[in-house]
From Swiss-Prot:
Keywords, sorted A to Z: Cytoplasmic vesicle, Electron transport, Endoplasmic reticulum, Heme, Iron, Membrane, Metal-binding, Translocase, Transmembrane, Transmembrane helix, Transport
A cellular-component GO term for this protein: cytoplasmic vesicle membrane
UniProt: heme b 2 binding residues: 86, 159
Residues that coordinate or bind heme b 1: 48, 120
Organism: Bos taurus (Bovine)
Protein name, per record: Transmembrane reductase CYB561D2
Cofactor binding note from Swiss-Prot or TrEMBL: Binds 2 heme b groups non-covalently.
Highest taxon, organism lineage: Eukaryota
């Protein structure tokens, strides 16, 4: 028996609510897991994985879920209020990422190791730079009068698309980090696979949210 359009809509919304809640829990759980594993303060390097997971797993995920119709924790706020919270969370994520990048550079300098010698390092640098550009672009949406010649709808579309790319770059950096000697020496077996699933799950949820909010809607418009 075929489901009615209304029933399918309710099921789809319920699935998005569940997946959004899962993204909140996974983003927080992964960050706590990395913090416990790294024991921040035990060494200079120990702050790097903590700050990067805080930036690209927790803060950036929460910054994007702010706009989720089903799972936002700030649904009571106006669109403008959520946009400002989004920008603050993104800025905090950028600051954490910059600090994490700076500390690992200092750590490598102390050990006399080469910089950007791995795909993890290159992806991480690219993700941090992209996040910086994305935060700068967000200023144009907070204050659209700064860009009077650009239609606001197009600015939102470009910002959302670019933000999704930046988020996926951050997720890729985390995945590559879990292939590093430091991580694989401590985390093995099924726990490693569960850890790898964390950024994959949050990335899929964010991709679905952005695609439905901007990309798919724009594609079906005449």
């Amino acid at each position: 028996m075929a489901l009615s359009v209304e029933t399918e809509s309710h099921i789809y919304r319920a699935l998005r609510t569940v997946s959004g809640a899962a993204a909140h829990l996974v983003a927080l759980g992964f960050t706590i897991f990395v913090a416990v594993l790294a024991r921040p303060g035990s060494s200079l390097f120990s702050w790097h994985p903590v700050l990067m997971s805080l930036a690209f797993s927790f803060l950036m995920t929460e910054a994007l879920l702010v706009f989720s119709p089903e799972s936002s924790l700030l649904r009571s706020l106006s669109r403008k209020g959520r946009a400002r919270c989004h920008w603050v969370l993104q800025l905090l994520a950028l600051l954490c990422a910059l600090l994490g990048l700076g500390l690992v550079i200092l750590h490598k300098e102390q050990l006399g190791k080469a910089h950007l010698a791995t795909w993890h390092g290159r992806a991480g640098l690219l993700a941090v730079l992209w996040a910086g550009l994305q935060c700068s672009g967000g200023v144009g949406l907070l204050y659209p009068k700064l860009l009077p010649r650009w239609p606001l709808a197009k600015l939102k579309l470009y910002h959302a698309t670019s933000g999704l790319v930046g988020y996926l770059l951050g997720g890729a950096s985390l995945l590559l980090g879990m292939c590093s000697l430091w991580f694989t020496a401590t985390v093995t077996g099924g726990v490693w696979y569960l850890a790898v699933l964390c950024p994959v799950i949050t990335s899929l949820v964010i991709m679905n949210q952005v695609s439905n909010a901007y990309l798919y809607r724009k594609r079906i418009q005449p």
